[in-house]
Amino acid sequence: MKPLYLFFVVLGTLCSSFAQTGKVMDELKLNSKILKGERKFAVYLPPDYETSSRSYPVLYLLHGYTDDQTGWVQFGEVQHIADKAINEGTATPMIIIMPDADTGLPGYTNAISGNWNYEDFFFEELMPHVEGRFRIKKKKQFRAVAGLSMGGGGSFLYALHRPDLFSSAAPLSAWMGPQTLEEMNDFAKRENMKFEEKNFNAFLEHNNPLKLVDQMSKETLNSVRWYIDCGDDDFLYEA
């Protein structure tokens, strides 16, 4: 029995050694004219990226408040989870893009102050850059967005603002940002940011998911596949 046991141990070790692994780069940079400076992002490339010439679907994975582009790599174990899912056949090989939305003013929206337009950067600079640099399929059906907490709010808004670009969205424990003037004042004080109260209603109109959903046709809303998750005891549940 012992030799047979050892045989299966060795066989398991050999099989695991053949499992392909992807590649993560978490200090990539691009220069942003919109944000007037250098921006960092991380990328996960699937196991067969270096040995194939094919193009891949893309997932834009957004981090939470106080994290940066390394959050999903270091704490979310994105490489281990993606490799395992791809090798087991439960996920298709894909490229995952993880941008930094913490350096400067944190958040994925265009700031109410008007001097930090992160959402414009995301759609006008980041997406064209990475989809030109890596072999990414550029059609809606091959593009998804997901995120946690602040990133969950970002994925919610991006899919609602641009349903023509994303086929799927997965907001996880989404923080939707300030939804009242009092919350906006608290956020501005915490981030040392100035804004004019007269601009708040327009900001809220553009960044409140309930208002955005009400303005969309059922057909447009259903053109995106939604996975929305938040635990019963999560303090963000009310959002």
How should each PLM-predicted stretch be described?
Residues 1-24:
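Bacterial Sec-dependent N-terminal signal peptides
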Residues 20-239:
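Non-catalytic cap/lid and distal C-terminal segments of serine-dependent acyl enzymes
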